[in-house]
Amino acid sequence: MAMAFPLSYTPTITVKPVTYSRRSNFVVFSSSSNGRDPLEENSVPNGVKSLEKLQEEKRRAELSARIASGAFTVRKSSFPSTVKNGLSKIGIPSNVLDFMFDWTGSDQDYPKVPEAKGSIQAVRNEAFFIPLYELFLTYGGIFRLTFGPKSFLIVSDPSIAKHILKDNAKAYSKGILAEILDFVMGKGLIPADGEIWRRRRRAIVPALHQKYVAAMISLFGEASDRLCQKLDAAALKGEEVEMESLFSRLTLDIIGKAVFNYDFDSLTNDTGVIEAVYTVLREAEDRSVSPIPVWDIPIWKDISPRQRKVATSLKLINDTLDDLIATCKRMVEEEELQFHEEYMNERDPSILHFLLASGDDVSSKQLRDDLMTMLIAGHETSAAVLTWTFYLLTTEPSVVAKLQEEVDSVIGDRFPTIQDMKKLKYTTRVMNESLRLYPQPPVLIRRSIDNDILGEYPIKRGEDIFISVWNLHRSPLHWDDAEKFNPERWPLDGPNPNETNQNFSYLPFGGGPRKCIGDMFASFENVVAIAMLIRRFNFQIAPGAPPVKMTTGATIHTTEGLKLTVTKRTKPLDIPSVPILPMDTSRDEVSSALS
């Protein structure tokens, strides 16, 4: 997971006014899969649509003309060459000079990234990744977003994304992301860079071995079954349910047991630790979209009731994690340990137990950072995936019918197993397509730590870069019917879509060396939950429920929840066919025919 980014300024574009969300300043109507109100779109006269299309074509033509005329071309000064020659004459080695001046190239012209300028008010009424899509359609796969002295590079080109995330990943850090998350994740795997990241990745990745993932399938099934019990009660009473909060509690219960063997039991209880976790989660999300980092003001931490609550919540969580680490250490010391590649303690198969049993020599503070990182990353993203998957399913009954047919055939009335994961192909494609339309997160953040060339554009170190996964996943250049929810766009007998076989136009879990290490864990978690809920219930948008709208946070949330009605499925009875026999058939012949 990566968090959405803070905004200090934003570009000037035309947007319609919408109602502000209490969760965030960045909101967009999302009653359809493309984040717009379909009723509003359908009400626009064809003549107006044609006019808008003509205006858009005119803007793009003007941009092409400006590029052709050299408006985005910078003529390089001969000054760097003069300096380089002078330094050479006084004995500076040529390899040092080449390194110092390589990014500046020769005295030839070089292209300048197209630039969009503006003010913060222009897009405060929309989730930020929506205006980025509109700008992408105008400016192309890479452009600079400039406001005052600050600028960002927006990347929506798969080849450039691949270069940043994979081919030259060593030249990029997490940048702003690490600064935002330091208060809660410290030097955990997601915000960490350099040698700390390499060491922690080497320690944690082996914990996610095949035996562990297979054991987690049972955990996913048990937790999903507890959610089904709550839905059974709601269906019996005819009550509507708010699924986003339930999915959040489901994934919190799963990640607590999977990572550090702690039973939050949040589907049935509310405790101080659960409240503390949600306080910290909301703070992390709010910081990711706040235009002013007031939390960095020393006195603010003391006078702000909210910041005092965050500090208290963090202390409670850290104390709880310290207790869990101490308990697990005692358990490891007492067991007759024969550690091996797929080691797993049957009583406590958690990642924490694996790390301690492996002899991972780190401080309790580093362990806490790792556990907190996995808690946040593994909780919010999966909850968001399930929320938008079930929203999409309410819009396509034909997809639900195919989904139920597969689930009935593969798992029937039992819990799924690791062997079923390969058989639930259509269920997996539903999840794949949900992640395409609603990527979690919608933007990946990087900062250049070396000079580089993106496409044809030279960039300097220190550039903040936003890779728009939303744009990549909805680009009409790479997807047919890009806005349509169509799980069958990938053949069921083909490979599971990922960044490699989709040429980085599809980044559900990022890509390159910093790709999410829990991609298989998260995929199976989502598939199990979808299968178990769909086999038992039918879901529809609740009568009178507010339109589903998006808001920006660490992931894509709804503004007012996903309110659905739940009804228990009634499967057709499987009545065996009875052969028609003559009236004078004997009893023995009847028994033989029915046996």
Curated annotation (Swiss-Prot):
CDD domains: CYP97. SUPFAM superfamilies: Cytochrome P450. One of its GO terms (cellular component) is chloroplast. GO terms for biological process: carotenoid biosynthetic process; xanthophyll biosynthetic process. InterPro entries: Cyt_P450, Cyt_P450_CS, Cyt_P450_E_grp-I, Cyt_P450_sf, Cytochrome_P450_Monoox. Its cofactor is heme. Residues 1-28 form a transit peptide. Heme binds at residue 516. Its EC number is 1.14.-.-. It is found in: Plastid, Chloroplast. Pfam families: p450 (PF00067). Keywords: Carotenoid biosynthesis, Chloroplast, Heme, Iron, Metal-binding, Monooxygenase, Oxidoreductase, Plastid, Transit peptide. It is an enzyme of class 1 (oxidoreductase). GO terms for molecular function: beta-carotene 3-hydroxylase activity; heme binding; iron ion binding; oxidoreductase activity, acting on paired donors, with incorporation or reduction of molecular oxygen. Disruption phenotype: Accumulation of alpha-carotene and alpha-cryptoxanthin. Triple mutant cyp97a3, bch1 and bch2 has a highly retarded growth. Alpha-carotene is incorporated into photosystems in lut5 mutants. Heme-containing cytochrome P450 involved in the biosynthesis of xanthophylls. Specific for beta-ring hydroxylation of alpha- and beta-carotene. Also has a low activity toward the epsilon-rings of alpha-carotene. The beta-ring of alpha-carotene is the preferred substrate in planta. Belongs to the cytochrome P450 family. This is Protein LUTEIN DEFICIENT 5, chloroplastic. The lineage of its organism: Eukaryota, Viridiplantae, Streptophyta, Embryophyta, Tracheophyta. The gene is CYP97A3.
